Amino acid sequence: MNSVIIGNGESRSWFNPEIKREEWVDIETWGCNAVYREASPDHIVAMDYAMQQEIYDSGYALKNNCYFANWNVVPSEVAEMTLMGYDIPQEFIHFNNRQKPTEQCVIQGKDPNTLKEKIELTIKKFPNLDIKDLTLKMEKDVGIWITYVEETDQVTPIVGRNGYSTGNAAMSLACESGS
């Protein structure tokens, strides 16, 4: 079987969401991030916490194959205990849009206090990087992301691909699946 990776932003400019799925015979489709808004590929891959939460909130992950990085389901009580005793500004706490918490959740995040240190370390290691671009990308998704989940969702945790971009993770997963 062949695979097609539908990338992000400009890298998906070639993609026409009007193409009917039936026309892609023997082709497995892997979409990145927000492509779910305009199409329904066989699989969606997301590495960023905010995008994962958006996909989950849309209901897409309840009916479609999704692959999310750092996706570890824990009892919901863990979320409450995680927030106890910390003075975390509200702008750094991101809950998904569920009216009522479920019995399980996923807790992810980036500590804004250690972020500057990580940026400086990365710049030392890779001095030729565009510092402005690096900072913009690393500051993305700062805070705690708490997503209450359903037991019947279609999310598969991405394992062993820390540091991959979404497109690279999608290609790796497609190869691993044998397509």
Where are these regions (language model features)?
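Acidic/Gly/His-enriched mid-domain segments of enzyme catalytic cores or analogous surface patches
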Residues: I19-G178
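N-terminal glycine-/serine-/threonine-rich phosphate-binding loop
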Residues: M1-T29
